[in-house]
Amino acid sequence: MKHLLQKTLALALALAAVTSSGIASAQEIREHAFKVSQANPKGHPLVTGGEKFAELVAAKSGGKMKLNLFPGGVLGSDAASVSALQGGTIEIVVLNSGILASQVKDFAIYDFPFLFANAKEADAVVDGPFGQKLHAKLQEKGMVGLAYWELGFRQMTNSKRPLNKVEDIAGLKLRVIPNTINIDWVKALDGNPTPLAFTELYSALEQKAVDGQENPLSVILANKFFEVQKYLAITNHQYNPQSVIFSKKVWDTLNAAEKKVLQDAANEAAKYERQVSRDADAGTLDQLKKAGMQVSEFSAAETAKLRERMKPVITKNGEAIPDTVKDMLAELDKLRK
């Protein structure tokens, strides 16, 4: 009888421990509201991805954690948003991964022209050890890399003339992301690069301060560049992953359960956002044509010429990050075997 009583008591204590542990786990998640800064407007796949991210965070936290989205660059330029994130006044920023080269030089690799042959290659690299290693380097700069989303393959637009061959680019004043490699490749094509924050781009195109720009189709449509640009050339010259980054200053105040909610939600939203982006591409081109854009596409021979003209740019910019270039090429080599 005594033995039975002891077993019953032990079982009761074990059940109580499990129950209390479950309650404690649920109570670990506290109420939070986080701001999310994005450059693109509502309706763009990245903002749709942000909406899914917010939905997932709310669901996984039982409604305790909330993401407030600020699309369209209303919280400032990418550079200003990163600075605010480092200071802890903005918690989350979604931005072109290459822009982070101003913080960690290795991120310049993501702006190398003709790096990825297709989106499948890009996914494998950024989701694998290479991409995670680069995101880990952000911590020393006050940022936590949660996931990679997608902006996509970049195309060229301008208001001057159709682009059918490499020589057509010569003399065009093209807005570029403010970093060295983008300035260099436009110069290599005899164009005139104009570094400019994305939030200033539409007005610069409208006022003819620049002749053209280069961005994925989704960006061209969502930001209505067709209103101020007549010619679109399909060049696929660069693929842009997007980094979802979190303020380390705020991250360090979160507990393990809260961090897991954010990390899991960011990863799930990545798969969703990439699919939305890729599903939209064909329809986006049709919409741009209907909006009046004249579309041209580089032939295989012209694309080969474009690659050749950019090789010295890749060599020059690779000298500053030799180990990163070596690791990237090794990853791509494995994927292509």
Model-derived regions, located:
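Bacterial N-terminal signal peptides
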Residues: 10-20
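N-terminal secretory/targeting leader peptides
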Residues: 13, 27-121, 129-132, 136-337
